Amino acid sequence: MDIEWQISSGLVEYEVAVNAMVSRVDKIVQGSEREMVWLLEHPPVYTAGTSANSSDLLIDNLFPVIKTTRGGKYSYHGPGQRVVYVMLDLKRRNRCDIRAYVRDLGVWIVNTLAEFAIDSYFSSENIGVWVQNDMHSEKIAAFGIRLRRWVTYHGVAINISTDLTHYSGIVPCGILGSGVTSLRALGKEVTFEQFDSALKKEFYKVFA
């Protein structure tokens, strides 16, 4: 597959990234650009997906709050989190099935985490990748997806070394009582370079 992988250094403002992503998606739809997987980090921000409830925003002045076009509810992005924007043309794969695509994303992230001896699972009910921790589950990767003419955009956010206290201003993904975790919180000190390498390796096992 002729897919471009882009890794941005430093922190990329959320709205700047979304505008660039939408522009790229338009070109993929038109057939003038290759598909892309974009790996980046954002400065601290809360994003409100298309089904966000205002009651899930607990502290409205902690970080900027931005409405976004992805599916889902409130989420947090910030330093130490690997954001993965996936721009794939599902028509080219004869896979015009959004549920199957989301499941494939789940398999990809679960397999990537397994590279670092993390046992996780994808939930189709509470969309995302979770880790069972003692008596409850904690989310380690959040999903938010949108399609334009069967080209995917937005994607996945995986907590590597994220400051988990930054989630205190929201009900993450609208799921009361659920926790969040990170590779660091699970005792895994992993660099972005190491994680990105595993992501790329496992990607081609799922998205042939």
Curated annotation (Swiss-Prot):
Domain BPL/LPL catalytic: 31-208
Active site: C173
Reactions catalysed: octanoyl-[ACP] + L-lysyl-[protein] = N(6)-octanoyl-L-lysyl-[protein] + holo-[ACP] + H(+)
Main location per the UniProt record: cytoplasm
Pfam families, alphabetized: LplA-B_cat (PF21948)
Coiled coil: none
Keywords: Acyltransferase, Cytoplasm, Transferase
Binding residues annotated for substrate, in chain numbering: R70, G71, G72, K73, Y74, S75, Y76, H77, A142, F143, G144, G155, V156, A157
Biological role: Catalyzes the transfer of endogenously produced octanoic acid from octanoyl-acyl-carrier-protein onto the lipoyl domains of lipoate-dependent enzymes. Lipoyl-ACP can also act as a substrate although octanoyl-ACP is likely to be the physiological substrate.
Entry-linked HAMAP family: LipB
UniProt protein name: Octanoyltransferase
Species in which this protein is naturally found: Anaplasma phagocytophilum (strain HZ)
